[in-house]
């Protein structure tokens, strides 16, 4: 194990000791630091310490001591590691100064067979140009970003080397459009899952929103729909995400702060007042308590008179990435996976148009991973879900078409586009070859994209409009099915109505003014993009081999493998930013003195109002009916799940019992507490 990973493991052991003594106190302290204002709750992503140290700390952002290898950057051993790194850089700079020049043929010949024309160009035109004007790393302010040969080192944001020029020599000898790309709407889906691209239907403009009370969030939803939004995405507050009611001691000071507070069916009814759920697609970013919140949504639709078979939307419900990155887990992994598969089975039977999971790489990337790690870990999470469902006895072609994904769109324009293109091809290969899916809809990867909250800066926040515009354009050129674009003020606080509208308008400019939606996969055939796409695909399968050898993602998580990989990547990125090898405009270069903009403030009165509502609800509901429903839920949760027979779902499936409890107005906290009594709670192990 290298020094960085060893220190990450040491730090995780320190954090892992306290929960055994005081789990409740540990949860409240650590989760406030980890989750407050995270992308899951506000749309900006997890502002990990690796960014806040340099970019400025958000009022709702991640604390600088968040886990998995970040806090140890202050450790003496790590400082020594960093000093060695800087000395090595200085030595390379000295070598470069002594060097008369860089051989222009070296990069041209490295790992490839250039054409005679390219060789001639390198020896003549390029050589003369380098003599007159040496190359300088773009995005490096200090001049330390040099290769071993003394020449400028150009990389993607993830550190992948980038050549000066890409030609046919950078692609496999057998590369052809027919073999490697195919056509839109046809396998392997590199060029998209729809034959008409965005000509038939634009991507869904789904702005992530939720704050304070259900009443206030409902007003924001109506506002967004009025201004051209055609989908909704619900951000829940921290207590809801962790399965606590607003009047729980854990919730004090957190109610409505980084999302909307939803305690009961009554709150969900208010949240969607005036919104036709049969005509509006809704995404809900909720994980451990996903079954309870989804049940509330279904009952609201039922009360509106909607047909469950016609409603469409997405439940995030991706618990694996919580253990890897976001840390909003409640139950142990196996029990959590059981609840996820329950929703697969129930959804396949009763809500065939509703996506019962959105397998998320967004949070993995926000935690500091590279683009490749985001791609590989996210898709392999999908592999794990399919395998668990098949072990339950479910047919992959019944639940497979409703699996969806959620990716991050970061700053490196071409790397992100390549990631999206590779993702579709990889998923097709896995579903067809590994799992034997016959239904072509099971082969399709459909995904939502959100721009990178972790890339936003608190300094000069208007610059964030340009950042998210480029990130959003990359998602569109990569073929996303829906898109959220972060608001420019989200590094500081929850977005205001004005900043949220600006983010929506930016999507609309891309859609209606840029021409990006006029043609399908316009960067196909670019030697650079095709090389990046192949590298992403090959790199992902290399990770899959490692994860297979560990016994799957749950086993890998228990060993800490993905967590350590992300910690290492985040450390490397942060060091490069602090050394100004990577420029962040307005934060570590082009800095000015400025006044802070006006931000949205959530008062403490929200919590008091939610407590009063809960007290009134418990006074008027049938509490005996609630007690009976919760007891049935506990009995079902204790049963061994198995596949249903004769067209029916399993008797052990928890969803029908959760629905019964919801109809009786049991609260989120009461439902989650019933499951805690059966499953217990999870405390992350130390990693070595």
Where are these regions (language model features)?
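Acidic/polar, glycine-rich intrinsically disordered N-terminal extensions of enzymes
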Residues: 88-266, 271-278, 301-304, 542-545, ...
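Gly/Pro-rich turn-and-neighbor structural signature
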Residues: 120-162, 168, 173-176, 229, ...
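Active-site cavity-forming subdomains of large catalytic enzyme subunits
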Residues: 229, 251-391, 416-430, 461-469
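Short beta-alpha connecting loops at secondary-structure transitions
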Residues: 253-257, 282, 322-331, 364-369, ...
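Short glycine/threonine-rich loop-to-helix capping motif typified by GTGT followed
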Residues: 293-295, 368-376, 410-422, 451-465, ...
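Flexible glycine/proline-rich, aromatic-decorated loop/lid segments
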Residues: 395-399, 437-451, 459-488, 495-520, ...
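Long, amphipathic alpha-helical stalk/connector segments used for oligomerization, subunit docking
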Residues: 483, 490, 510-566
